[in-house]
Amino acid sequence: MSEAEARPSNFIRQIIDEDLASGKHTSVHTRFPPEPNGYLHIGHAKSICLNFGIAEDYQGQCNLRFDDTNPVKEDVEFVESIKRDVEWLGFTWSGDVRYSSDYFDQLYQYAVELINKGLAYVDELTPEQMREYRGTLTAPGKNSPYRDRSVEENLALFEKMRAGGFAEGTACLRAKIDMASPFIVMRDPVLYRIKFAEHHQSGNKWCIYPMYDFTHCISDALEGITHSLCTLEFQDNRRLYDWVLDNISIDCHPRQYEFSRLNLEYTIMSKRKLNQLVTEKVVEGWDDPRMPTISGLRRRGYTAASIREFCRRIGVTKQDNNVEMMSLESCIRDDLNEHAPRAMAVLDPIKVVIENRAAGEEWLTMPNHPNNPEMGSRQVPFDSEIYIDRADFREEANKQYKRLVLGKEVRLRNAYVIKAERVEKDAEGNVTTLYCSYDAETLNKDPADGRKVKGVIHWVSVAHALPAEIRLYDRLFNVPNPAAAEDFLSTINPESLVIRQGFVEPSLADAVSDKTYQFEREGYFCADSRYSRPGALVFNRTVGLRDTWAAKATQ
């Protein structure tokens, strides 16, 4: 299959193919323009993969441009986080990082040009009056009493705005288009507003800041963007995008195309609601492993490759649709099943004493991956005292239970066959210690007498086990569409985080956060980037071995 044939086909790529074939464009230039007022989430990853992926596939360019036109909400912290996320996903932007604030001087001159053409005016309606004058979807708006000011007066007032002569909220620059337009975005939209706030790039040079719709199209044009890709909520804004570029002296006129945003079940994408989760301490922070932020997914153990594959699988369309969480989880399972080294961890330990074995360690060679010899092997200690998981033992059980039962045998992973002989209990009747015998001739082989041992369980040596905090992360919400609830916080899954104190094998002593392991029979886990350190290990569950929510949904 050729590289072109391997590309995911969608309507945007078809448009690009047609533009290149017709000679409308000789190259492709896209951009990813986030506002630095928060952390990127999985929905942004879709846009990143689309814009950077197109540039890569067509040997074009993709700019990283920060839409930094609101100094009140923006911060360098978010700038650095976004740059880190884009790079972590595996993409490189063309040239230097760009900022809309780089173009503030030019944007101001284009605003003056619109005033000189009689296409913009300084309005002094209050925000409340402006909303009243705007009209509704079924009723036209009405003209501001300041709409017919002369060019000279508007130029003077706009300069006064720039000089700080108006208080915030008392004046703004508006485009003069059509207050009766059926599209509210075209009813004399605001182009500039006043904000007395220090900007993270330009400092205190400006006290007036351009609006997104004015800035976005001009920035695209100044950078020579060929295909400006936005989500569907900006579809009506395309009319204003074109109006601005049609009415200023600029050579390049990019075309905007819209695609559906990502709606992922069991999560929310609203920046306001995500911020509420953080500020109300429902989650630990923006990088909480339950959050849909890229930093949260990274801390949870998701790989960049799995997120890119997810974006490839869901595709790009114009139709809004809900994507099942299992689609994302399937991508990380597929990736980790192939690439994650194996290790053993006991999350709910019960002590096992092997009575017919002398104390003393024996080092067993275990493969790091059962299907990939190239991943090598590791040495794991075995001794006469081990931990197994409490769920792997029953005093009585039916034939469907394939683990350890009193009086019966089970195989220890990559080790020996053991038989449960007797138990020791506490005053409440809980098993505290399990006494077993082992067959010394069954190391990685069947019993010599031909008896069948069906079950296999994992274990760790008591003398060598490393204590670890195991954080069992799950979906943050317990309904598919939490945003539809009257109070989305009422749909929080109370079991989205369960903490266990367990033990892991010694090979994990130096586990690092950017490496995810399969804890055999438990799931995929990574060391927590914030808290885990040698001697105080903390592991986050990335995803279980199988989807347990599908079964819940049918109950």
Swiss-Prot record:
Belongs to the class-I aminoacyl-tRNA synthetase family. It is found in: Cytoplasm. The keyword ATP-binding applies. It comes from the Bacteria. Its EC number is 6.1.1.18. It is an enzyme of class 6 (ligase). PANTHER family: GLUTAMATE--TRNA LIGASE, GLUTAMINE-TRNA LIGASE. A motif ('KMSKS' region) lies at residues 268-272. SUPFAM superfamilies: Nucleotidylyl transferase, Ribosomal protein L25-like. The lineage of its organism: Bacteria, Pseudomonadati, Pseudomonadota, Gammaproteobacteria, Enterobacterales. One of its GO terms (molecular function) is ATP binding. It catalyses: tRNA(Gln) + L-glutamine + ATP = L-glutaminyl-tRNA(Gln) + AMP + diphosphate. Keywords: Aminoacyl-tRNA synthetase, ATP-binding, Cytoplasm, Ligase, Nucleotide-binding, Protein biosynthesis. ATP binds at residues 35-37, 41-47, 231, 261-262, 269-271. This is Glutamine--tRNA ligase. Pfam families: tRNA-synt_1c, tRNA-synt_1c_C, tRNA-synt_1c_C2. L-glutamine binds at D67, Y212. The keyword Chloroplast does not apply. Its main location: cytoplasm. GO terms for cellular component: cytosol. GO terms for biological process: glutaminyl-tRNA aminoacylation; glutamyl-tRNA aminoacylation. A motif ('HIGH' region) lies at residues 34-44. Monomer.
